[in-house]
Amino acid sequence: MAIENKLMKEYQYHIFSPYRVCPLGAHVDHQHGLVTGFAIDKGVDLWFDVCEDSHVHLESKTFEGVVDFEIDAPSQVRERHWGDYARGAKFALRKRFELKRGITGVIQGSLPVGGLSSSAAVLIAYVMAFAKANDITLQPFEVVKIASEAEREYIGLNNGLLDQACIALGKKDGLLFLDCDSNDWRIIKRNPEMPEFEIGIFFSGLTRSLVNSDYNLRVYECKTAAWNMLAYTDQPLKTFDKTFLRDIPKATFDKTRIAMPARFARRAEHFYSEYRRVRQGVTAWETGNLKLFGKLSFDSCESSIHNYECGSPELIAIYEIMRQLPGVYGGRFSGAGFKGACIALVDPAYKDDIEKVLTEKYLAQFPEYEKTFQVFWVKPDDGARFV
């Protein structure tokens, strides 16, 4: 807090860009599916001043080194360094706007945890800061699209809109529901009859980089499944980048799944079953049925393990432990499910017992993570904003 107070005095502007959790709608945004999510009350803080010239100078309280570049120059080749996210934000903004003024600032993350879309939170903070410095007014969904494009085209992660939408559009009193095909979205307010809950984040101790994981491979497998269905039914093939499972009716999948390689059939099965779970989950949320909503989140994780085939031994162990604990309504892997964390919706009265038992059982299986396994408790919050 002392560091934050000092930075607030030192810099004119402060952006808070929250992390996000997705209880339902995992691994389907890149196929134009339906997703849900929350922004949470932990995230990334960016303090900055606007420069009179085009120079960008950034420091991090989380990572070593400094970042320096010119905002009006073409983006250089990605350096696989934390500064790539600032360069990616510049890259996507310069495709739309003229950028003349840079910033001087400091960025800091509040949780050392993978699986909460910290990269998307950082990108959104930079997009908002560079827009502010150059007197560019962006609507929240414009921020979503620009940040997603930066991560996809510059960072190299073939994501959809889920992460950025939760971070930019989230509200503390409701659940984000987004159709990644039409980009229609709404906040579904909490039903007054819904029980109280908090969100547990159970960090496995493993860190990860999605660019170097099987994340992109899974995206290609989903598209290949879609191509298989089009080919087996003699429909015209689209280019790979324009091929999405959302465009193919489930009835077509039911007819063709036996003919396609099992791997691709499993990826498609996850997509279509997750579509159904999100629909059911939205109804459960609207009616205040947190027990059903939680069960659907558990079922989503089962499909992620067996159909989408993600999840490290560590994450699967956390999931299997928390599924048996009293007070856990539901939960799943957070993010892509390659290392990182699990999230759970829990009854606050059981928090202490859940943390104690889960920690004991997990470390009994994986004692090597005794110093890095962590449990955090968070709540839904509003999306990215100037503080």
Per-region residue spans from a language model:
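Short, charge-rich binding segments
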Residues: 37-38, 47-50, 97
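Gly/Ser-rich oxyanion-binding loop with an adjacent helix/lid
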Residues: 1-34, 68-73, 79-194, 324, ...
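Short Gly/aromatic-enriched secondary-structure transition segments
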Residues: 32-39, 218-219
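Glycine-rich phosphate-binding loop
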Residues: 338
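FabD-like malonyl-/acyl-CoA
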Residues: 121, 341-346
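C-terminal nucleotide
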Residues: 2-24, 45-81, 174-330, 345-387
